[in-house]
Amino acid sequence: MRRALPIMFQGTHSDAGKSMLATAFCRIFARNGWKTAPFKSQNMSLNSYVTLDGKEIGRAQGVQAEAAGVVATTHMNPILIKPSRDQEAQIVVHGKPYENMKASTYRNEFFHLGLELIQQSLHVLMNEYDRLVIEGAGSPAEVNLNDRELVNMRVARMANAPVVLVGDIERGGVFASLVGTLQLLEEQDRKRVIGVIINKFRGDLSLLEPGLRWFEQYTGVKVLGVVPYMHVRIDAEDSVALSRYATKKDDAKAIDVAVIRYPRISNFTDIDPFFAEPDCSVRFVSDASSLGEPDILILPGSKNTIEDVYFLTETGLFSSIQRLYERTNVTMIGICGGYQMLGECIKDPFHVETPLDAVAGLSLLPIETTLACEKTTVLSEGTLVYKNEMFDVKGYEIHMGRSIVKQGEPLILLSGKTDGCKTKDERVIGTYMHDLFHNDMFRHHLLNGVRRKKQLSPLMERPNYRQLRAQAFDDLADCVEKHVDVKAIERKMIEFQRGEHHAL
């Protein structure tokens, strides 16, 4: 019977680079001929991925499955937590909404069910794959939470997985973070840590080497590698990553793409393809004073559309967006929650998001939205009609609500139905389809249309985003193989399987 060899990546904090390293190892193992699966027992994220059977998992595990060349399933992320408001989140179990819970309720009442779900998924994956790349969350040294944690050392024990601890040197204090984390671990868990990887390094490695030697002597734990800072086009999962994005226009780029950053922004990976375009400056906007006059304004998805509409009002963005449409030639695009905001009204008769019955939208699209208790999660494809051209597009939908188009024209023709809406002048468009901009032909047409409006020649050579993503997986794997002792990690994986737990 097949029995997967597991390896687990844990970090000193969120956004240390666990997801990226897990993705790299999924690619490395797959390239070496091993059938490989990613696993994250519990993921807290507003960036989702829809599986082939219409289930919802964390974006990172979907991307890691792509890197491994396997079909993503809910066993790769059996529990997904989607924050919807302060101290409350939607709990998604095996890709379907389970219940909205307060943080305290989840901790006190979900623990035993969570353990059972995790054990079941581990059993399935361990018996179907050769390698299992497990990702932790946050830090394993959260001493106030460890008695009922479901995602770090408890999972390592359940899978009998060796652990690699990841530290982010870019933030500073990496040795303090690594040493402090190791010291706060229980002795049995500390023995699982086979080494550390220092991530996001910039500069002269020789200046770091005395610190590496000191760390190994002080802790007895091996430094398995120092990974340089990498600019890779692979989806960010954690909203912490948003802090790295620009808030000001790059004047060297011809097209100014502004993205509204509201508190409950979700699936912001929708805009990733614009970062690959040579003439696009992408910036995030969170107040009226920084809106300016962009060429393209994107209202992305939201986990709580009504609360984020109030955010637009409180920050002055609501009226500024309306004035922007009236006074400029901007193209506005709403995706999912952003599409709902562009409409006339968002009704919430079942109080899915807030105690309010309804809220007024921006009234830039002739639609009305009614939120519902049942969530739609589906892969979709169809024909998009825009500026007298037709484009085959595919993506996915994740939403709780339906939008009725009162007038105007649909944007996308699906099999037996339509999706989205556009104004007659096609300056405002909206859709429930995530990954819309991942469709190269439409994205290229949109951007070259903006160039023509600005009396600039269109660019005939633009990137194929899916090819770039595939290349990014290989570039990432190449970089990690160069800078990390992969063979030492594989040896420890085999030793743990045999029950040999001695030091490196």
Curated annotation (Swiss-Prot):
What are the catalytic residues?
A: C336, H434
Can you tell me which residues the record assigns to a coiled coil? Answer: none
Q: Which Gene3D superfamilies match?
A: 3.40.50.880, P-loop containing nucleotide triphosphate hydrolases
- Annotated GATase cobBQ-type domain residues: 254-442
User: CDD domains from the entry?
Assistant: CobQ_N, GATase1_CobQ
Biological process, per Gene Ontology = cobalamin biosynthetic process
Point out the signal peptide segment. Answer: none
Record's keyword terms, sorted: Cobalamin biosynthesis, Glutamine amidotransferase
What pathway does this protein act in?
A: Cofactor biosynthesis; adenosylcobalamin biosynthesis
Q: Which GO terms describe its molecular function?
A: ABC-type vitamin B12 transporter activity; catalytic activity
Q: Which InterPro entries match?
A: Class_I_gatase-like (IPR029062), CobQ/CobB/MinD/ParA_Nub-bd_dom (IPR002586), CobQ_GATase1 (IPR033949), CobQ_N (IPR047045), CobQ_synth (IPR004459), GATase_3 (IPR011698), P-loop_NTPase (IPR027417)
Q: What superkingdom does the record give?
A: Bacteria
- Does the record carry Metal-binding as a key word? no
Family the UniProt entry places it in? Belongs to the CobB/CobQ family. CobQ subfamily.
Q: What does this protein do?
A: Catalyzes amidations at positions B, D, E, and G on adenosylcobyrinic A,C-diamide. NH(2) groups are provided by glutamine, and one molecule of ATP is hydrogenolyzed for each amidation.
HAMAP family recorded for this chain? CobQ
PANTHER family in the record: COBYRIC ACID SYNTHASE, DETHIOBIOTIN SYNTHETASE
Q: What is this protein called?
A: Cobyric acid synthase
State the organism named in the record.
Anoxybacillus flavithermus (strain DSM 21510 / WK1)
